[in-house]
């Protein structure tokens, strides 16, 4: 008598692991000659743009750029802005095979000091957070034949990353300030946001379409023809489409793509009526493939004593696309020192998914205002909000989310209250895990037979009892019990008398 066993490989995921590193940020901003002197610093912020995680030789590298923005008041009472861009990078030791890796970068405490009228020193840190899932290859039983072997066969759908692809390109466009606007002077603040609106997978190619949104808050040049002082807010939307080479990718695969927009480079045209905009964009595409895994979760022999070894395995079984646009309406009460509003905007932070699957939105609500004498002021407050997501109620093992502002507008009421309406986009993927037991080894003792079976057994099964347990107890197949008793479900829906013949 022979026992024929067939095994298959399956990549199991370990417990999600998180690694952290503090990266110092130290820089000095020396004001260019055409910038006015510093009298008072109003606002300073560090913003980051991260690159995709790079895996190489047992290390996972988190990198990107951090931009330190400083808004200040000049000796003439003007609202001015300057910034310093610097790269960052940190490599984490991650031995073993990594199933998935994603990073986030959080801004820590930043200190700012005007050393003199022309120099601003900044000292602080950012925190790089790496989230990984280790992959472990296991051999599990897929089928067994001979020697009276009876298998409880199950099937699970698994999702694995078929490939990650990166393509960098640069968008260079001209933005018109519009009719009646005075000549451009200088930038107070600017921002960029990239959104992929369409993503298609074809054989060995990924096709993306979307748009890049640029916002610029600016003031006119001092001797402009228009007497308006500003500031003015100009918004530009540039459509983009790019194709990414992706060898080995199938049309049936699922793709999650995003445009990572760096900090824009903006300069005025000679006549000050247009802006020359240059921005670096990174397309990051992650492709997922679904597979069906058949395995044996339990077995026994109708003829011989058998020994079965089972292990608990965890797999990524679902990749849930997350694309949620949340309309946020907030009121900003003006402090007594403020009389008029210059600008109100929202700066979203890294979104999270809580244990219950809900999305957690954190943001800073920011406002430039003026006091009764026309001097610039700055205020901000934090926003925290939970919203529904497609991943609610799921066992989330891992997620990759990004955020940006789709649309935004503000108004200033007579009662001394600023109101802001923002459409916040949360985009990315949440990965769900499934844990189950599978047979990893089995053997039979051909010297020990199970003995003769009774001709017939009447068994009274309780509600909720599993037919497999009954079949294993009496060493008959589950299929024969279902056929003999005209049953269609493995779990008894009520107390039932079962004939085992």
Regions found by a protein language model. Give the residues of each.
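Membrane-lipid interaction segments
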Residues: 2-446, 450-453
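Generic beta-strand/beta-sheet core signal
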Residues: 362-366, 484, 501
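Primarily a LysM-type cell-wall glycan-binding module
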Residues: 445-483, 488-500
């Amino acid at each position: 008598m022979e026992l024929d066993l067939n095994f298959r490989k399956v990549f199991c995921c370990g417990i999600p692991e998180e690694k952290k590193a503090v990266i110092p940020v130290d820089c000095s901003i020396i004001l260019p000659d055409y910038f006015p002197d510093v009298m008072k610093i109003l606002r300073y912020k560090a913003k980051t743009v991260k690159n995709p995680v790079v895996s190489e030789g047992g290390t996972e590298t988190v990198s990107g750029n951090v931009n330190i923005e400083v808004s200040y008041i000049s000796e003439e009472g003007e609202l001015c802005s300057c910034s310093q861009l610097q790269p960052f990078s940190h490599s984490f030791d991650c031995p073993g095979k990594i199933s998935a890796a994603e990073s986030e970068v959080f801004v820590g405490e930043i200190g700012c000091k005007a050393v003199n009228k022309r120099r601003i020193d900044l000292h602080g840190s950012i925190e790089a957070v790496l989230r990984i899932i280790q992959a472990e290859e296991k051999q599990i039983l897929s089928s067994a034949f001979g020697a009276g072997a009876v298998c409880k066969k199950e099937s699970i759908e698994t999702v694995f990353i078929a490939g990650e692809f990166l393509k960098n390109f640069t968008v260079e466009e001209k933005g018109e300030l519009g009719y009646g606007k005075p000549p451009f002077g200088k930038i107070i603040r600017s921002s960029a946001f990239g959104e992929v609106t369409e993503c298609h997978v074809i054989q060995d190619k990924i096709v993306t379409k979307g748009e890049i949104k640029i916002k610029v808050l600016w003031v006119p040049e001092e001797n402009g023809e228009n007497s308006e002082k500003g500031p003015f807010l100009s918004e530009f939307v540039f459509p983009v489409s790019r194709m990414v080479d992706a060898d080995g990718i199938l049309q049936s695969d699922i793709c999650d793509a995003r445009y990572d927009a760096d900090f824009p480079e903006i300069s005025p045209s000679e006549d000050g009526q247009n802006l020359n905009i240059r921005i670096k964009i990174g397309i990051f595409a992650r492709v997922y493939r679904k597979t069906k895994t058949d395995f044996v979760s339990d077995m026994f022999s109708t003829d011989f004593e058998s020994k079965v070894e089972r292990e608990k395995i965890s797999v990524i079984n679902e990749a849930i696309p997350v694309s949620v646009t949340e309309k946020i309406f907030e009121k900003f009460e003006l402090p007594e020192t403020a009389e008029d509003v210059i600008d109100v905007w929202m700066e979203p932070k890294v979104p999270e998914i809580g244990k219950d699957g809900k999305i957690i939105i954190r943001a800073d609500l920011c406002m430039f205002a003026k006091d009764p004498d026309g001097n610039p002021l700055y205020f901000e407050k934090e926003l925290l909000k939970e919203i529904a997501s497609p991943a609610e109620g799921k066992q989330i093992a891992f997620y990759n989310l990004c955020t940006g502002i789709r649309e935004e507008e503000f108004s200033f009421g007579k009662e001394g209250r600023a109101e802001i309406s923002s459409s916040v986009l949360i985009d990315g993927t949440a990965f769900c895990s499934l844990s189950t037991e599978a047979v990893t080894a089995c053997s039979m003792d051909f010297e020990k037979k199970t003995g003769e079976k009774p001709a017939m057994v009447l068994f009274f099964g309780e509600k909720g009892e599993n037919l497999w347990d009954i079949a294993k107890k009496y060493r008959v197949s589950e299929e024969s019990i279902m056929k003999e008793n005209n049953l269609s479900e493995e779990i008894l829906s009520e107390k039932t008398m079962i004939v085992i013949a």
